[in-house]
Amino acid sequence: MWITALLLVVLLLVVVHRVYVGLFTGSSPNPFAEDVKRPPEPLVTDKEARKKVLKQAFSVSRVPEKLDAVVIGSGIGGLASAAVLAKAGKRVLVLEQHTKAGGCCHTFGENGLEFDTGIHYIGRMREGNIGRFILDQITEGQLDWAPMASPFDLMILEGPNGRKEFPMYSGRKEYIQGLKEKFPKEEAVIDKYMELVKVVAHGVSHAILLKFLPLPLTQLLNKFGLLTRFSPFCRASTQSLAEVLKQLGASPELQAVLSYILPTYGVTPSHTTFSLHALLVDHYIQGAYYPRRGSSEIAFHTIPLIQRAGGAVLTRATVQSVLLDSAGRACGVSVKKGQELVNIYCPVVISNAGMFNTYQHLLPESVRYLPDVKKQLTMVKPGLSMLSIFICLKGTKEELKLQSTNYYVYFDTDMDKAMECYVSMPKEKAPEHIPLLFIPFPSSKDPTWEDRFPDRSTMTVLVPTAFEWFEEWQEEPKGKRGVDYETLKNTFREASMSVIMKLFPQLEGKVESVTGGSPLTNQYYLAAHRGATYGADHDLARLHPHAMASLRAQTPIPNLYLTGQDIFTCGLMGALQGALLCSSAILKRNLYSDLQALGSKVRAQKKKK
């Protein structure tokens, strides 16, 4: 019996290899044939110069001719897809509904200061890391990454017996030692946990492979149990974080501390997979980084590459629908311009608007209910929404004693129970029972801040919320949602500020202004479906190997592709992987192999020097 099983495994592996090799037979140019990184130029601070790149408003005259593709949405998933295609000689138009390009990478002004919308910190940005290498290739090396302090994260547990602090230090050895100092009786558990994190995270390439292989083949591999048998990553994608931590024998408090980073993906330990959690822990374990001059630099240095290939990135361009030809193939988009609709035709349409917006709103009604479309939507649900608080402070980071460290504040070790109770409460009671706060200090992370905004600082607070608490006002115009809406937002702000002032008493009398945005703000500015911070929920169903294989760049609509976080994972690096998967599908090239080859070439050249 075992011989038959072994032969079957070998046969399947041979088939997988042959199919995989046969997938990439396209003749498209290699976008990563040469290293385009060049010495960084001086930072551009002139507002008009930046506006010409980031705020090019849509007009018919600015639409390039003979387009190869149109991208809906200018978040990193959309911009990176466009940039990669541009490097392959494609002329791409990116359409952004907001007034400024960048999606969650854009910044905005408040009370004379600058705030980020979604980039709080990024891991593995040292020279030589693959994420840094990819970004260097689509920005020509113009992004500069500033390392954050160590500890880069500080978990604070507020309990009946007082406050406990758990620092997360940069460097694997230092990270582990920091945990062991807090839990000396659980050193063996910590060692087993960290080894499992390493093994699982290093198998993430299996998730990428699942999205390349034909779906029937992945279903066959899943049916025979080969995915979970041979891939630690796939196996961990069928286990919840809570399940694994309990199996390791961690105490309730250690379980809470090891799970502290959950706000970066928005799901509690019982409802997300250990594989996703391991990816995030491994991503940051060597330390965290922040883009010098803020997150708008990402879009600012990606857009010129798209433009030089004959493409454009246009704002104030709300896409109303994806156009289909008589055969049901995507052939362009319809853009709202004033009271009129402008049709733009192209052979390929790429949506960075998320699965829900794309399938439920942008497709013609005649195809929204196709079996394959409905099947994909049954695998996902909208993710967690958050309320954002933006605080302007008087004083430098030194005067206010602010570090670049992020603060994760919890009030209970049972995160599942606390969150479930919280989101099920009436909205009037919820502010009294906020289960966690995420508090970053953007101004303390940016080395250029003091030159640009002397003697002032910023602080951001993210509070988990239920979209249902704000849903009754979603049809009301921005700024005209009424007293009850503003009162609810203020109640959350006041509850959060009460906690903040206890944590940072030195800020008393230093607060200049406090503003905030609800999930409706995310929905308005970022076109986030139901205000979801991370798109489709990163729960057990979405991250199961079968769903991972099914949710890919290719859609049931020919010539329509998805990019960004909904086809891989959340965050800058997750959305960037989505862009590589999307571009690989369009170009019919294995861009991961192309990047690997270029990386080897660059390393060899450096050795010669």
UniProtKB/Swiss-Prot annotation:
Predominant subcellular localization, coarse grouping: endoplasmic reticulum
Single GO MF annotation: all-trans-retinol 13,14-reductase activity
Catalysed reactions, semicolon-separated: all-trans-13,14-dihydroretinol + A = all-trans-retinol + AH2
Record membrane topology: Peripheral membrane protein
Tissue specificity of this protein: Highly expressed in liver, kidney and heart.
InterPro entries: FAD/NAD-bd_sf, Retinol_saturase
Enzyme class: oxidoreductase
GO aspect biological process, one term: retinoid metabolic process
Leader sequence residues: 1-21
Parts of the chain that traverse the membrane: none
Coiled-coil region: none
Compartments in which it is found: Endoplasmic reticulum membrane
Entries under PANTHER family matching the protein: ALL-TRANS-RETINOL 13,14-REDUCTASE, BLR7054 PROTEIN
Function: Catalyzes the saturation of all-trans-retinol to all-trans-13,14-dihydroretinol. Does not exhibit any activity toward all-trans-retinoic acid, nor 9-cis, 11-cis or 13-cis-retinol isomers. May play a role in the metabolism of vitamin A. Independently of retinol conversion, may regulate liver metabolism upstream of MLXIPL/ChREBP. May play a role in adipocyte differentiation.
The protein's name: All-trans-retinol 13,14-reductase
Species of origin: Rattus norvegicus
